[in-house]
């Protein structure tokens, strides 16, 4: 049968098809006629975007139906990748690109093999199979590139009992990874571990190199007593997030936990409890926030004051 494909320029293309043709097949026919690669084509019928694996009959597209062709702009959007040397790389990507795709683009530009790349966004290490949109990475977002050094190093972890544990690590290991290694050696669950270096508590998603932890550095391990507590954070959309916290956690800590779960930068968060806005340096116990209390999260619009 014949169908028509109308482009945004108003041009109409006529195609010979069968009901059993898939959307991929149709895109190939359009490529043959117009030279537009399938991955730049979006086909719309009855207000719906058509999926590649489905057939014309799945969408009840009959003879002399008209599809609309929208071009998927090459690159979709720009993002930035900042290396530890301070160099910033600009990449053309789409929200649907996977982290693997992004690593391949970095390899094309910089020659760094994907297996030596770790990408960090909002404090989280990004997993290869996930997409940019999974992590809410939008245009002009900045990712951080950490190199996974071949050949690792030793660091020491000192417990409050005075015992010292030796670990084999890499600069690109995240704090989560280090806690897992401690669990393997000592049997202490990661959620009961707090690691301190140079007086700072280390955050799970960050890497050793982020904290300038080098070979033979000593970290201090403090046990987080069981019996933290759960609190709830309610957003303006009505979504409720559950957090594991301790009374001694500061409001900054709580905002970091929200960032880990939701990807919202702390400087865009305002937390309200009992009608009061909570200040970063204060603790939950300062505000008498107890187990199963509900905080309200209001977003601070960029550019406000």
Curated annotation (Swiss-Prot):
Residue location of crosslink Glycyl lysine isopeptide (Lys-Gly) (interchain with G-Cter in ubiquitin): 6, 11, 27, 29, 33, 48, 63
Record keywords: Cytoplasm, Isopeptide bond, Nucleus, Repeat, Ubl conjugation
Gene Ontology cellular-component annotations: cytoplasm; nucleus
Cross-link Glycyl lysine isopeptide (Gly-Lys) (interchain with K-? in acceptor proteins): residue positions: 76
Keyword Coiled coil: no
Top-level division of the source organism's lineage: Eukaryota
Annotated ranges, domain Ubiquitin-like: 1-76, 77-152, 153-228, 229-304
Protein's UniProt keywords contain RNA-binding: no
Propeptide feature ranges: 305
SUPFAM superfamilies the UniProt entry points to: Ubiquitin-like
Record's subcellular location: Cytoplasm; Nucleus
Listed InterPro entries: Ubiquitin-like_dom, Ubiquitin-like_domsf, Ubiquitin_CS, Ubiquitin_dom, Ubiquitin_ubiquitin-like
Role summary: Ubiquitin exists either covalently attached to another protein, or free (unanchored). When covalently bound, it is conjugated to target proteins via an isopeptide bond either as a monomer (monoubiquitin), a polymer linked via different Lys residues of the ubiquitin (polyubiquitin chains) or a linear polymer linked via the initiator Met of the ubiquitin (linear polyubiquitin chains).
Misc: Ubiquitin is encoded by several different genes. UBI1 is a polyprotein containing 3 exact head to tail repeats of ubiquitin, UBI4 is a polyprotein containing 4 exact head to tail repeats of ubiquitin. For the sake of clarity sequence features are annotated only for the first chain, and are not repeated for each of the following chains.
Homology family: Belongs to the ubiquitin family.
The protein's name: Polyubiquitin
Organism: Candida albicans (Yeast)
């Amino acid at each position: 049968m014949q169908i028509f494909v109308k482009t945004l320029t108003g041009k109409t293309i006529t195609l010979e098809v069968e009901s059993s043709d898939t959307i991929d097949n149709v895109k190939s026919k359009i490529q043959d006629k117009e030279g537009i690669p399938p991955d730049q084509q979006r086909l719309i019928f009855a207000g719906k975007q058509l999926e590649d694996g489905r057939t014309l009959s799945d969408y009840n597209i009959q003879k002399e139906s008209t599809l609309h062709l929208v071009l998927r702009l090459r690159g979709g959007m720009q993002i930035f990748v900042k290396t530890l040397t301070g160099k910033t790389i600009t990449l053309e990507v789409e929200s649907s690109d996977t982290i693997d795709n992004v690593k391949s683009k970095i390899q094309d530009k910089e020659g760094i093999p994907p297996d030596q790349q770790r990408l960090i966004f909002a404090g989280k290490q990004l997993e290869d199979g996930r997409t940019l949109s999974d992590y809410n990475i939008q245009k002009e977002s900045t990712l951080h590139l950490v190199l996974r050094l071949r050949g690792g190093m030793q660091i020491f972890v000192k417990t409050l009992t005075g015992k010292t544990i030796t670990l084999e690590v890499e600069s690109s290991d995240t704090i989560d990874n280090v806690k897992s290694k401690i669990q393997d050696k000592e049997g202490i669950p990661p959620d009961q571990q707090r690691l301190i270096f140079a007086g700072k508590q280390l955050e799970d998603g960050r890497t050793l190199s982020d904290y300038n932890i080098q070979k033979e550095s000593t970290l201090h391990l403090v046990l987080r007593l069981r019996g933290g507590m759960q609190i709830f954070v309610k957003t303006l959309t009505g979504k409720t997030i559950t957090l594991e916290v301790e009374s001694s956690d500061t409001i900054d800590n709580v905002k970091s936990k929200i960032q880990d779960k939701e990807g919202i930068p702390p400087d865009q968060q305002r937390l309200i409890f009992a009608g009061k806005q909570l200040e970063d340096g204060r603790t939950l116990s300062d505000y008498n926030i107890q187990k199963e209390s509900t905080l309200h999260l209001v977003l601070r619009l960029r550019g406000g004051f």
